[in-house]
Amino acid sequence: MKRMIALDGAQGEGGGQILRSALSLSMITGQPFTITDIRAGRAKPGLLRQHLTAVKAATEICRATVEGAELRAQRLIFRPGTVRGGDYRFAIGSAGSSTLVLQTVLPALWFADGPSRVEVSGGTDNPSAPPADFIRRVLEPLLAKMGIHQQTTLLRHGFYPAGGGVVATEVSPVALFNTLQLGERGNIVQMRGEVLLAGVPRHVAEREIATLAGSFSLHEQNIHNLPRDQGPGNTVSLEVESENITERFFVVGEKRISAEVVAAQLVKEVKRYLASPAAVGEYLADQLVLPMALAGAGEFTVAHPSCHLLTNIAVVERFLPVRFSLVEADGVTRVSIE
């Protein structure tokens, strides 16, 4: 019997990423874990619907036995079984992030006995989680270089607080992991601005695009009007395509915040990324830790290691026989496997 790994959910950033990473790694390695003080660092601690859906999805995919899978629970015991490929559907029942549920189970399905399709309904445009286009256009091309083949499709948008969105991913077992080397971003090739609208006046999008164009030379400016019943909602995105990597940044519009202020938040975030020679943005760095650890080698550069990144590394090192090295030099932090 494999040893039980004990995790403190209050460590580091104290959010849901500790639980999501633990579920992924437990399914992959077969190691059971117990976690206490789940999401202790959040205003509403414990399992919310999104986290509970991730637990239930993991349980179904590997036939796990679990204790504490209840709303607002702050302690969970998870004993994994064998990961099985198949056609899975999960509903969050709120505007909780569909992509974060996918993020939890897809790594385990890289090791399944056959191809899989996972469909999750819930929120797709959430201010605290990556939208599906980030997964499609930024993360999945990098995963493909690592030998990981998955394809995400956004079937329906779902904005906060209504939800109702649907995202699906098709994924195949990995035959061989390749290492990823992302030391330099390279020169910028082009930048693309994009606005999504659902049940929001078009002039909002036009003002947001104008704000982006006032700070950057945009190769493309796209406004997409979604069906009114998918809203109300508004998301502004800016994609930076460089020689070695494509990064994508976004801000979700909010009531009583002007279009100019929303777009200015995005401008600030992109300028912060471009001010450093680092290849990888803050959020993408979190996403690369697990596949890089599974490959057993690789590196990337990031401007500053976030608390999220450090916490994720700490969890990965509890489950896998790897050690990460973080070295600061020349205005970046180089993250690699020792």
Swiss-Prot record:
Subcellular location: Cytoplasm
InterPro entries cross-referenced by the UniProt entry: RNA3'-term_phos_cycl_insert, RNA3'_phos_cyclase_dom, RNA3'_phos_cyclase_dom_sf, RNA3'_term_phos_cyc, RNA3'_term_phos_cyc_type_1, RNA3'_term_phos_cycl-like_CS, RNA3'P_cycl/enolpyr_Trfase_a/b, RPTC_insert
A single cellular component GO annotation: cytoplasm
E.C. no: 6.5.1.4
Residues annotated as the enzyme's active site: 308 (tele-amp-histidine intermediate)
GO biological process, one term: RNA processing
Keywords: ATP-binding, Cytoplasm, Ligase, Nucleotide-binding
Sites where the protein binds ATP: 103, 283-287
NCBIfam families associated with the record: PRK04204.1-2 (NF003246), PRK04204.1-3 (NF003247), RNA_3prim_cycl (TIGR03399)
Protein name per the record: RNA 3'-terminal phosphate cyclase
Species of provenance: Escherichia coli O17:K52:H18 (strain UMN026 / ExPEC)
